[in-house]
Amino acid sequence: MKNAIVDIKDVNKIYGTNHVVKDLNLQVEEGEFLTLLGSSGCGKTTTLRMIAGFEEPTTGSIRVEGEPIEDKEPYERNVNTVFQSYALFPHMTIFDNVAYGLKMKKISKNERKERVLEMLEMVQLAGFEKRYPSQLSGGQKQRVAIARALINRPKVLLLDEPLGALDLKLRKQMQLELKRLQKKLNITFIYVTHDQEEALTMSDRIAIMHDGVMDQIGSPTEIYERPATKFVATFIGETNVFDGTIRSIENGRAVVSIENGEITSSGSVEEGVEKNTGFAVNEFVTVSVRPEKMHFSPEPVDGFNVPAMVKDYIYVGSVIKCIAVLPNGNEIKMEKLAGEELPAIGEKIFICWAPEDAVLIHSLDNRFYQSMENIKLA
């Protein structure tokens, strides 16, 4: 990456027999909002702590602005960290909390005042400088913590699940505020969360970590629409997966054997195989289709068609979640807008989707995806 401000190369972190981060290579662009996303224990927070200087890599290197930082103390690195716990000084006013870093750097009193007031206005807390942390709401405390971190003008701001303690409505509001602030200041944000919606809402790119490995990195659209692994497909939102084996590839068509049926795919599969970048006969694969991409039909139509029976509907506000049962007993999840005409529970229907909405994933190496076309139940 041409303008990488953070460059992580071949980094491993091992605690005893626990290999927490495995051969991580990651470049973060200047001014980018990058999110490290994954479930608990995947290595995302450890990665953040290594950048901050609270942990050291077992092997590998980390550079910020092209300079190695492994031998630098946390306070010597041009990065600041915001934690979920806020870590505000309860005996200090909001002004003094935000000004603390400037005071330690012996910045003049007049400049401190000017920069603190400017930063409080930026995080929409103008007029709060004389209050104490105990007089603020959770969202206000988090904005103070962010202001305190940003006032030192770091090149990189590290955020470790900073919104995790907030209620849902406030969390959504803070997501938009953080994104606005990041774009206004043009500071690189590296954000850690296990919340998929949070990552999709704020990020320029998302790095998905799983069991210490970075499974995929890409834009929110790429991650959601074209997952590279089965883990990514099932971790980001909901999806329907069909596991099977490619039985044959002939004349541009790949036939995938699944339980109680076959899925036939045509299109660019053959070209991929010829180039040794696609799929092969006897390969174990996964087909992934998002619930919102599926549709009801009273009759089979061109494309992929699945006979099923409507089992249940779940109302969740503007969306209705639909559950249908396949002949083999497996369930398929669909999403429809509230108010749409829907078949009755117990009614037998066909489920279909557009060819470009299905994704074929290599299941063994979990490192490649391919769109499927003209998919249907054989």
Map each language-model feature to its residues:
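Non-catalytic connector elements of ABC transporters
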Residues: 239, 249-378
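ABC ATPase nucleotide-binding domains
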Residues: 33, 72-234
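Conserved ABC transporter NBD signature motif
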Residues: 60-68
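Conserved coupling/switch loops of ABC nucleotide-binding domains, chiefly the family-specific signature
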Residues: 58-61, 111, 211, 243
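The feature captures the beta-strand-to-loop junction immediately N-terminal to the Walker
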Residues: 37-39
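ABC ATPase nucleotide-binding domain
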Residues: 7, 27, 63, 350-352
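Helix-to-loop junction immediately C-terminal to a conserved catalytic motif
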Residues: 52
